[in-house]
Amino acid sequence: MSFLLVEPDLVTAAAANLAGIRSALSEAAAAASTPTTALASAGADEVSAAVSRLFGAYGQQFQALNARAATFHAEFVSLLNGGAAAYTGAEAASVSSMQALLDAVNAPTQTLLGRPLIGNGADGVAGTGSNAGGNGGPGGILYGNGGNGGAGGNGGAAGLIGNGGAGGAGGAGGAGGAGGAGGTGGLLYGNGGAGGNGGSAAAAGGAGGNALLFGNGGNGGSGASGGAAGHAGTIFGNGGNAGAGSGLAGADGGLFGNGGDGGSSTSKAGGAGGNALFGNGGDGGSSTVAAGGAGGNTLVGNGGAGGAGGTSGLTGSGVAGGAGGSVGLWGSGGAGGDGGAATSLLGVGMNAGAGGAGGNAGLLYGNGGAGGAGGNGGDTTVPLFDSGVGGAGGAGGNASLFGNGGTGGVGGKGGTSSDLASATSGAGGAGGAGGVGGLLYGNGGNGGAGGIGGAAINILANAGAGGAGGAAGSSFIGNGGNGGAGGAGGAAALFSSGVGGAGGSGGTALLLGSGGAGGNGGTGGANSGSLFASPGGTGGAGGHGGAGGLIWGNGGAGGNGGNGGTTADGALEGGTGGIGGTGGSAIAFGNGGQGGAGGTGGDHSGGNGIGGKGGASGNGGNAGQVFGDGGTGGTGGAGGAGSGTKAGGTGSDGGHGGNATLIGNGGDGGAGGAGGAGSPAGAPGNGGTGGTGGVLFGQSGSSGPPGAAALAFPSLSSSVPILGPYEDLIANTVANLASIGNTWLADPAPFLQQYLANQFGYGQLTLTALTDATRDFAIGLAGIPPSLQSALQALAAGDVSGAVTDVLGAVVKVFVSGVDASDLSNILLLGPVGDLFPILSIPGAMSQNFTNVVMTVTDTTIAFSIDTTNLTGVMTFGLPLAMTLNAVGSPITTAIAFAESTTAFVSAVQAGNLQAAAAALVGAPANVANGFLNGEARLPLALPTSATGGIPVTVEVPVGGILAPLQPFQATAVIPVIGPVTVTLEGTPAGGIVPALVNYAPTQLAQAIAP
């Protein structure tokens, strides 16, 4: 069956255009008639007369043909006009008959039920002033939207397909009327209508209409008590948002859809965000007087953000922000809401609200949500009362299997004391703790920074301490987070300045990964007072570095101590610098973290005053029990500068270096802090002691300047009187083992890492494809009701073809929504089917990886090239050939060492030097063992000139003992005129079999399966 679509207006326009063309042609033919049909003869002779008659006959024939064409043209234009009129009439008759049929169909239901079968409901009466309007009429039972309500009237409900009508806004007269409720959406498809807004600030908003199967819930209207949110369709749809002012929860999403946002409020807590299954949770509502609403939770998607807290109208205290929504399976947690700021009650500053905790991530994948910031504390203006404390930052959310922990929230600022207040300004809020990283992989979250302590504006008040930085989150496989920085202490005008907040501890890595760095301490508060003013505030201590993982990982660096607060003329002395944090220790393999530097003592400016003492430095972390270097000790804090005839501050000692255990060097001691300038200058600190070296191998760390000589751990070469060959054997063996270990620590188990990364990538690709396909399938299903609605409209207009097209298109789009042909070489299907296509690539990728591994382990090719112009070259071997070369190196170096020892013994005997002969004989076992383990040699291999372009080339093949490091090949080419030139060849290295097995081969296999 075929269909013909005709637009009558276009046919009529075409006929008019053709008539215009015919008119122009007729005028041209008339103008040419006389000159071409009656030609005058050029002469009186017979030839001229014959020529005139001939061409005149041509003109007459043209006019005859033109007349016939004009007749045909007129008939064709008439037919076009007639066809257009016929189509127009048929269309009008069809519409008329369809309208008559529609009226006949609607009549029974309109009479019995007061609503049509197909059609929109009537809008409610508008209403005037304080007089409420009418409710919107219901939509058609099969199809139609509900009518909108008049002033304060409810929206009409839809039938099977259609949207609910919007509730009318409340009337503005008098106290203002409540908004009307939104109408319910269609049973099969349709959105709920929006609730009407209240007519005044004191009036209630209307509730949003509900959806049933497919459709979004209506939003509640705003008002003094806003309207409730409409429910989403059961299968697909977003939950409605609760009305502003309601403090009600947002509606939950359908099976596929987002939760609605909670309503804000000025009289109670903010509403919670709606929950979801496959979609994002709704955001919590904010409140100006109470706690913020919690963010909505979800199964697959992102959690909603928590709402901001407000300020209590009764007490002036800040109220906590809402917690971020958590995720069940896949997705990131929502951010916590900010805590509310505090004000004062009868002049007394109140405490601020804490930030909301970040939501936890999904079980399979996702990052924890960030914690909300704490609010600022209230200021105090009356005597004897403290100012408000800043709110603590919210904790970051935790990850589950894969993902990073959330960052902790920033602490709020402490309140100030002003006027005649004589108590203490508020302390800054503590930073929130970072979230824990994923169990299988992920980094811990960073701790939040502490808040600034409140300043003491009046001379009788004490300044507030800075808030402590948040502790960082730990990790299982991954790096621990960094600790939050401590907040600066508040400044004072005479009495005590605020102490700087301590930095948060770095996060610990539990299995594999490095510990996080500790946060820096906050700066001590300055004191601007003059005579008899208190010292500047002490700087905050730096946070300790986190420990490295049980199997591998470096300890985190300790945080630096905060600088001491400065003082003005007449004050006692500058503030003492904060203590540096201790570096984190490694457990089995890894280096200890560097100790944090001590804070600089505060300077004294103007008049006579003593500079502050430098803060003590942190010690370096200890190395892993098996292998690793100890951390360097922190630098001692420098003393602050004195003024006038007063002394500068004393510098502190440098931190001790961390110790090694079995293999590794001790950490160097930190440098002592410089003494502060003054009269006299402050004494400098001593350098820290270096850490002890490993028992099997390692040197003790150097003492930091300007300290005494390092207390060196006795090494084997200095404490055990053995012969040189045995010393070389032990030193070379330990050095090569250390090199192998360091290379492995830099990239442990690369093949296993790449394999696990591939599997995780396949899993993520599969879950993403299934999630996208499920979402697009639901979107396609949701598109069927609107298409049916469009098809009904087309049928009502007599357009059967359009109706069929709408229905078929909707069914197809459930599976394929379109085609992406932007790249003709890679045309892609869109929609659920196209979403699933990437999964089909996984078996091929796995098969290709297996093939690549097989090809790598069976590759016996050798490739060589040299560019004598640019002095570059490449020498590559297949993996089995490279491993064979590495395996045969040890027998060669052993034989060389045996031959050298034999030659030395024979030469000494022949020379009559019995002492040298005895030494060669005693040292021979060590030399042979050293050759077997650590020997290195290069074997010359002359290449045929036919393979080198006629230039003589000799390749030096590196061979080594089983522990010898891998070395590149070298080639020497004898270039005419220039002479011999040595080129280091890129490509495959060669050496000991152990580093080849531990480091080189796994790297080659990892590259074989890398995407």
UniProtKB/Swiss-Prot annotation:
Coiled coil residues, start to end: none
KO phenotype (gene knockout): Deletion mutant is attenuated in vivo during murine tuberculosis, specifically during the chronic steps of infection. On day 28 post infection, shows a slight reduction of the bacterial burden. On day 70, shows a strong reduction of the bacterial burden. Mice infected with the mutant show smaller, non-confluent tubercules. Mutant shows impaired ability to survive and multiply within murine macrophages. It is unable to inhibit phago-lysosome fusion in THP-1 cells.
Cellular compartment(s): Secreted, Cell wall; Cell surface
Domain of life: Bacteria
Region spans: C-terminal domain: 697-1011
Region (Disordered): 595-701
Other noteworthy facts: Infection of human THP-1 macrophages with M.smegmatis expressing PE_PGRS30 results in reduced production of IL-12, TNF-alpha and IL-6, as compared to infection with vector control M.smegmatis. No differential effects are observed on bacterial persistence inside macrophages or on macrophage mortality upon infection. However, expression of this gene in M.smegmatis is sufficient to enhance the ability to persist intracellularly and induce murine J774 macrophages death. Differential response of the human and murine macrophages could be due to cell-specific processes.
Protein name (Swiss-Prot/TrEMBL): PE-PGRS family protein PE_PGRS30
